């Protein structure tokens, strides 16, 4: 600057002053803010990178079903549904969730097991707990007085799952119900007949259907001295006798639900009884039960029921069991539950235990709870425990080494040569048009060995082979995959020959 004039020196000094001035407060704050954001983003990124790998799994109490499992499950469902249809039932489906207020009063002690949905549209909703309450709502909403229906669908219960025994939080139920005013015990007897047909058809082993009547249960409670305010909760405890010993149930009644010990002991005298029509007749003479008109009404219906069961040819599969209570509050009359007597994994060895595999009963007042005018539609029905049955069937198949085909393909269209995609497409379209289940590899030029291996692995019974020689001669080869035998037939008779072989197999 010594060579600059005074003015130029002052200008230069001012310029240097501007350049060397400390940053303003606003600038400092802005810079600090940007730095803070950058640091925070960096920390978040670091934290994200340090998180453990996400575990991919299904929610607790649920599961996926593989293609092999789906084949077994569908066969079980087909047998159950065909039985329902054989008895004249119509199919029905209802929403997977219902208005919460419609469900809460119907389950009482089981209310805490329901899955509630988050309120997003002004309606409080819950996933359905069973298929019975939605059916009753459907009858009331549509003012139906008579209906014989079946329904297959998933239900949800927030229980502790026991997956090793076929018990889940999400599971499938198959229900059959008869709604309407009919002469006593005829529909009830048919429901028990259906239960026997299904369990016999599935070949699960020996089974027993335990029956009782809620009026008999309430009568027992009354003559034993159970306060009316505790009837429902004590009945809920008694329903656990299939999972707990009488000592455990008694402890729950006394210690947790406040029942007097002497009252619990009097109940214990009754729950040991089980038998057939002779037990019903003996109970009529019981000096304690004879004091209850409600119990006598139930015993009268049970006596009539056993007569119909004898005519249906299933009386030997049914046993009156006074320990059976069925905890759901909507039951009003006959109740029943099917159990497998013993399903040995191997002769004389391990036993597969899954509890009850079917249950049901009469619920005459449920529809009236939905109907604005309180109109009664008596109902009786049953529910098949598909998951537990599936568990048993699956275990038996594992023990026997039985294999399952995951497809129903009957014919595979193949070629040993290149550039024969068009011919294969024409043939497979012809087979599909004839209703034949067929497939092919999605490649222009597949290797013949690859096609043969695919057929053998998938257990496809027949293979159609087309090549240049066959096309020129107007013929086609038909190969039996199992025996590896091949025959040459006229191209025009392909469909007829395949249909003939399939009908003979």
Swiss-Prot record:
Keyword tags: Acetylation, Aminoacyl-tRNA synthetase, ATP-binding, Ligase, Mitochondrion, Nucleotide-binding, Phosphoprotein, Protein biosynthesis, Transit peptide
Presequence boundaries: 1-31
EC numbers for this chain: 6.1.1.21
Predominant cellular place of this UniProt entry's protein: mitochondrion
GO BP of this protein: histidyl-tRNA aminoacylation
Binding-site residues for L-histidine, renumbered to this chain: 130-132, 157, 173, 177, 326, 330-331
Residues that bear Phosphoserine: 66
Sequence similarity: Belongs to the class-II aminoacyl-tRNA synthetase family.
Name of the featured protein: Histidine--tRNA ligase, mitochondrial
Originating species: Mus musculus (Mouse)
